[in-house]
């Protein structure tokens, strides 16, 4: 079949695209509005003049003063959006990736594709474009089981949630824009440095409120104790199908015995269950062979782990060659 592909840098120029993907959608552009160091783009695949697939990516500049390609990275999250059934998805993805590589040539130093949820999806497209992979773990909770979320928790998790309840921990939703500055400063100050380094700037946070929370495509939950914020979570909501854990945090040192992170995650999962969502997706949770840390922590909420991959490519061939040899 003959396909034509086009790259778009502005939301206003896009054709009409159905809302079939949380990550590859027209409103995803709104997240990067007024962000000078981020450049969103979308590749749309057409068949007979009609869109059949799209792939969203964003370029991030890590240096505020230098604008050369060495300080730019490109990220893609999740499989592309497909707008028709029975499409040759792998073939279309191959064309999307080839177009992305041509578009990014000499523009970025590093490309990362993550949260695919399938270790073999796009394998040929990645290999032919000289990507290397690292095995990762995806964790997802089904909210359609006969056992509800509470009964999926481990015994220790149940005890921790009950203890937090007894001590007066509670959850509130962020519904006013005026609450955002204080909340953002709190997050940036208290979460782990490595996590904070990846946390987006405040304007992104503000854009999420206007584009997602106002339109019921997302929630910001804050966990409180004695009117003090001790944790929280940002979740993305897609068509009553999937709730995505985008970010979560908690003052686990100061309020260790109140289990703020555990209580927040439990509440968010319960919220998704009560509102008819089918899955709660933690996405890429850690390395496939990692037995402790984040993967073990999340698995105690009753989810299932699935093998997946993250794909990487450096624009400098010799670095890419060394990285490929090291990781594979």
Locate predicted features.
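A conserved beta-strand-loop-helix scaffold within acyl/acetyltransferase catalytic domains
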Residues: 2-65, 115-138, 146-254
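Membrane-proximal basic amphipathic "stem/tether" segments
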Residues: 312-328
């Amino acid at each position: 079949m003959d396909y034509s592909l086009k790259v778009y840098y502005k939301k206003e120029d896009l054709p009409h695209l159905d809302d079939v993907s949380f990550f590859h959608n027209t409103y995803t552009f709104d997240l990067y509005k007024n962000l000078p160091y981020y450049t969103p783009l979308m590749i749309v695949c057409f068949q007979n003049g009609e869109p059949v697939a799209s792939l969203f990516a964003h370029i991030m500049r890590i240096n505020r003063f230098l604008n050369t390609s060495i300080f730019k990275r490109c990220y893609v999250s999740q499989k592309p959006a497909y707008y028709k059934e029975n499409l040759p998805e792998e073939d279309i993805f191959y064309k999307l990736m080839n177009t992305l590589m041509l578009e990014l040539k000499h523009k970025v130093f590093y490309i990362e594709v993550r949260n695919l949820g399938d270790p073999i999806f796009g394998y040929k497209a990645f290999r032919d474009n000289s990507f290397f992979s690292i095995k990762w773990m995806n964790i997802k909770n089904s909210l359609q089981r006969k056992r509800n979320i509470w009964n999926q928790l481990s015994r220790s998790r149940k005890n921790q949630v009950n203890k937090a309840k007894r001590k007066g921990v509670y959850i509130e939703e962020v519904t006013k824009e005026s609450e955002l500055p204080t909340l953002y400063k709190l997050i940036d100050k208290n979460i782990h440095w490595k996590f904070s380094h990846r946390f987006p700037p405040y304007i992104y946070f503000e854009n999420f409120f206007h584009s997602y929370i106002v339109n019921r495509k997302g929630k910001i939950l804050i966990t409180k104790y004695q009117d003090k914020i001790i944790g929280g979570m940002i979740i993305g909501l897609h068509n009553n199908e999937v709730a995505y854990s985008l970010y979560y945090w908690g003052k686990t040192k100061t309020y260790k015995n109140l289990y703020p992170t555990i209580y927040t995650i439990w509440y968010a999962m319960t919220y998704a269950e009560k509102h008819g969502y089918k899955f709660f997706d933690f996405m890429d949770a850690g390395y496939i062979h990692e037995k402790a840390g984040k993967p073990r922590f999340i698995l105690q909420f009753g989810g299932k782990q699935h093998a997946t991959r993250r794909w990487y490519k450096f624009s400098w061939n010799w670095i890419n060659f060394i990285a490929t040899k090291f990781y594979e």
